[in-house]
Each structure stands twice: as structure tokens, then as C-alpha cells.
Amino acid sequence: MDRVCVIGAGPAGLSVARALKRLAIPYDQFERHTDVGGIWDLDNPGTPMYESAHFISSRKLSGFFDHPMPGTLPDYPDNRQVLGYTRGFADAYGLRAAIRFGTAVRDTETAGTGWTVTLRDGSRHDYRAVICATGVTWQPRMPTHPGTFHGEIRHSSTYRTATEFHGRRVLVVGLGNSGADIACDAAASAAAAFVSVRRGYHVIPKHIFGIPTDEFGARGPQVPIRLERPAFTALLRLLQGDLTRLGLPEPDHRLFESHPLLNSRLIHHLQHGDVAVRPDVARLEGDRVRFTDGSTDQVDLILYATGYDWAIPYAQRHFEWQDGRPELYLTAFSRRHRNLFGLGYLEINSSAYTVFDQISNLVAHYLRDQEHRPARAAAFDRLIATDHPRLNGGLTFVGSARHRTYVDARTYRRYLRQVCARIGWPTLTPGMFETVRASS
């Protein structure tokens, strides 16, 4: 049982595979689909991806460590470009060789100090560690409303292209980043478009003074949140004005206290009357929807952009769950079972790719030191058991399940570096993966 099992070959799974390969840790990787890429592959059954989807973090600040996105890509690459980049990453580091495609994991169970993994074909394999990296957007959350609806009801995970809206009166329920994108598609293609929201949001444009917003924030001085927030709030007000005049409710939280809604098209469509804002749905009445303010609209299609229930079906019982989120040290290490990991089970206010690389670095060194420097691994075991860092960066996030595991990227990265220094592990440095490049 000297091998490690990696489940999933999306961005998180590829990140940890590269880290394991660099330290010569033997591993097997299982992917139920026919290729790498995870949710970014429109052909991957169950993916929530749609044709108009783009990165909400910019090209320069996204991408894997030491493998930047090509400068020929736009500021915000689309889903096909992200998929191509991700597959290029797998090829650059020769990661496909260890992946068994078309192979789903059915179950995992403890076996002494290790794990037994059962595949869909019934075969069983023993490993010393299991790394779950299958993502969080595979089980759509569908709300229910009283009444009867004569039209079509779907979750946004089934949506692919704006042609689905032609000639229809569309209601999008929910205004996260996907909901906003889809509402904009409906605004341009549907006979009528509405978006139902329960709360107000701070809408952040994708560019500020022509610079991608995350780059704009990174270029300036890194000031405390008590100074940054009022300055950025004032800037947004200057650029956009009062969004309540467009029908959006006043936010019930301060800027940065919820996942950023990054969208430059939504304000345009609201300003031009292409999409109308409605409050929460109260009930369904045949071909009409009644809202909590008593108003009604005739609707043909209700599309719920209401998020996903997190699940790890093949290992669900091994994790401790609270408010629908797994309890993990540094968002990755199980406190209950040694050598059970969850990679990618976090919400963060930045691009996740480099964050995956940073946490993968810890996972790989921890696994290596269990065999080569057991005292160092034991020191990290004590941290897993006793360390409970606050990773919110001084922010008070809104009280929703989504924000329970939310971390501030700047704080998170800094703490990961501190842990590495404390244990004696190296942090990510340019050139450290050159030895495992396929061309090397």
C-alpha cells in the first residue's frame, strides 16, 4: 500500500498529480470521463458549463503555478480556452499516463492504516491515501415553490446555449455569477427576461479603467480591509451609480462579504430594459409566477440558478459535514481520518488554480515525509488535530452555507506559507517543476 489514489482529473486533480509526480510519490488517478478538464468540458456528462461561460478571474492572475496562461488569450478566457489550457497543462507535465479514463470510483473504505477503493467495475485496490478532487458542482440544488406551473422548470446545470431561449419568456432564479451570465443570455435572446433575487449584490465590473479588476486590485498598495473597502465601494459607486434605480435591491452586506459577482454585461442589459429584476418567488400559478411583492409575470421557462449541494458520493461517510460543507484542515486535510484529503472543496475570492498548487504542495510533502521524515509528518499531524486558523482575512462573510468555508485568498496563501516554514517544507518557487516537464 505505498501508492496514492487521486480521484478526478479536473484542475484540482491535475494540480495534485503534478505535485506527487515531482516528489516521485507513486499514484493512480481515476477519471470517470474520457479526458481531463472536469467541469470545463462541455461534453462531460453533468457539467454545469454553458457556451457563454468565461473565467471570472483574469488570465494573468489565473492558471497553474509556473505554467501561465498564454498571452494570446483574452483578459477573461472562455470555457473552451480554459479547457484547452488545462489539457495543455496535463500534456506539458505528462500527467495523462497515470490516469485511467472512463473509470468511476464507486466506494472507499478504511483498511487498517490505509484505504480500499472500489471501482465501478467492482474491482478493489488498496492505497495508503485517498485524494478526492471531483469538485462541488455536480448535484444541483432545486428549490420548490407552492402551486402548479404549466411551463418548463430546469436547473441552470442543464443550460448550454442561448438558442434555448428563442421566443420564450424566461425567469432566472438566483443571481450568482452563473445566474447573471444566463440572465444576460436571456436578455439578448428571449422574448422576455426576468431575474428573481432574494438579496442585493455588489456588482463588480470585469475591468476598471481598462484593467482587469483583480489585476487592478493587485497592482495597488496592499492596505488593510478597513481602508480598502470604503475606497473600492466609493469607486464602484462612481463608475456605476446607484444600482437600486435599475431594480436591484440594496445589498444587506458590505463589499467583499460575499462571493464577488463579476459581470459587466448585467448592468448594460438592466440599463436598456432587456432584463427586469423581480423579488423572490412566492408561488406558481399556471403560466404565471407570483412574487413576494404581489406582482406576477407570464413565464414559459423557469431556470433555477440556485447552486449545488456539495457531495463526495464515494467517500461521503468518511468526512465530517457541517452545514453541507466538509470539515477539513486548511480546506484539504481530514481531521478524522489520516491520509484522506479533499482538494478543491472551498470557496475563495480569487482564481483557484494557483491555490490548488499551494495546497497540493503541502499534501505531497506530508505524504513523502510520512515515509522519509516521520517526525516532520507527526508535527503536521498535530497541526491537523489542534490548529484552527481564521482564514477570512478579517472579513465577516454573509451567513449562508456557501460562505461557511469561504477563505480570503491573500490570508490563505500567507498562512500556507507560514505552515510550510513552521514544518520545514519548501514553498512554491519558479522552476521547481521543470524536472517533471514532459520535454525534460
What do these predicted regions represent?
Residues 154-157, 386-391:
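Non-catalytic, mobile gating and regulatory segments of ester bond hydrolases
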